[in-house]
A protein has these predicted regions:
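Active-site substrate-recognition loop segments, prototypically the cytochrome P450 B′-helix/B-C loop
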Residues: 1-86, 95-113, 117-138, 147
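Structural motif
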Residues: 41, 82-90, 173-178, 192-193
């Protein structure tokens, strides 16, 4: 299946990567192009842009920082009183590391988690009465990252996800929708599985 993209396409306009996915028109205002929903060669080119961040060697170099932050978070937990593990540990550590990978201020770390939760719950009426309300939150995400994206185009390349996107030929001229789509892909990929793994690991 993975090797036969002509038949098993990942393109969003054909339904994307979800079984039973709904095809979208190219001019759909709420379509968010992202490389996970592209076929080769575009998928391969854009994926390779951010792959260096996640190779084993780089993750090993991040291990001391992760351990230090995890230790500090655990040291700050209340003693002999009930607390919310997900909020105070899982979300906190995940948010800190996401901010590091994007090289954005640590004080904005919970914004990244919030935007991940937003895109995960766009179709849930308990969170948003309409998908459009959720997209207003994502427009704030776009405005936030556009500022960094444009600034890093003008700065020397650095080893962070935004700079990688800003300097590679295949991603340096993305439309606002495509920038938002790929940023959301990276945020959700970093937030959802990591946060759930930390939470599930204590059960």
């Amino acid at each position: 299946v993975d090797k036969h993209h002509e038949l098993f396409s990942s393109q969003q306009r054909l339904g994307g990567i979800t079984l039973g996915g709904i095809a979208r028109e190219d001019d759909d205002a709420f379509a968010l192009p992202m490389f996970i929903q592209e076929d080769p060669p575009k998928h391969d080119k854009q994926r390779k842009v951010v792959t260096p961040m996640f190779i084993p060697r780089n993750l090993a170099e991040l291990e001391p920082l992760i351990r230090q932050r995890a230790g500090q978070i655990l040291d700050d937990l209340p003693i002999n009183e009930e607390f919310n593990w997900v909020k105070h540990v899982s979300v906190e550590l995940t948010g800190q590391m996401l901010a590091t990978l994007f090289d954005v201020p640590q004080e904005d770390r919970l914004k990244l988690v919030h935007w991940s939760d937003t895109v995960q719950n766009l179709g849930d009426p308990e969170f948003f009465e309409t998908p459009e309300q959720g997209f207003q939150e994502l427009f704030a995400c776009l405005a936030y990252f556009t500022e960094f994206y444009e600034a890093r185009k003008k700065a020397p390349p650095k080893f962070d996800l935004i700079s990688m996107l800003a300097h590679d030929e295949s991603t340096k001229d993305m439309s606002p929708q495509e920038l938002l789509g790929n940023i959301i892909l990276l945020i959700v990929g970093g937030n959802d599985t990591t946060r759930n793994s930390i939470s599930g690991g204590v059960l």
